[in-house]
């Protein structure tokens, strides 16, 4: 089972975004996004997940699968 960090990284690569690009679009700190992708943050907040999902145009649940 993939982690939220791996799912974000996969979608980000698929859309050709850098971590910095995604962080800016989702209005998150680059360091926060890097920690989520690196699985240092196992359970990011709902608001963070919602912002990232919105950038990707997917449901929050898709990031959690």
Model region roles, listed by residue range:
Residues 13, 24, 54:
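Alpha-helical residues within the helix-turn-helix
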Residues 9, 34-35, 64:
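Key DNA-contacting residues within the recognition helix of helix-turn-helix
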Residues 17-35:
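Short alpha-helical DNA-recognition segment
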Residues 35, 39, 51:
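Alpha-helical DNA-recognition elements
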């Amino acid at each position: 089972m993939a982690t939220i960090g791996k799912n974000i990284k996969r979608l980000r690569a698929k859309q050709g975004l850098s971590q910095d690009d995604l962080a800016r679009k989702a209005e998150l700190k680059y360091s926060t996004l890097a920690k989520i992708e690196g699985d240092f943050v196992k359970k990011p907040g709902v608001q963070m997940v919602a912002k990232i999902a919105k950038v990707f145009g997917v449901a929050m649940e898709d990031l959690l699968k």
